[in-house]
Amino acid sequence: MNMIREQVNGELYIYTALSDHIVRSPDVCGGRPTFKYTRIEIAGALDRLAHGESMESIVDGYGGRITREALLQAIDVAARHLLANLPDLAA
């Protein structure tokens, strides 16, 4: 994957895009996936969702720094990763 370099509000961001709203950066959160332009890890938001919290509550809980669309993309990225890394059952 290609690293993207962009200047936003005077700050340089270097990351790999996993989707429009989900990125990985070696300098942010140990390279774990985050919501773009934040240090909010998708794992935390997905954990809250898995424990029954509504999307609206999660978005509100992050003070509007993420959107419902971004949360849906986090679900998609996680699902694609899971399916791409399933072990072979023929062993």
Segments (PLM) and residue ranges:
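Acidic, low-complexity/disordered tracts enriched in E/D and polar residues
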Residues: 1-40, 79, 83-91
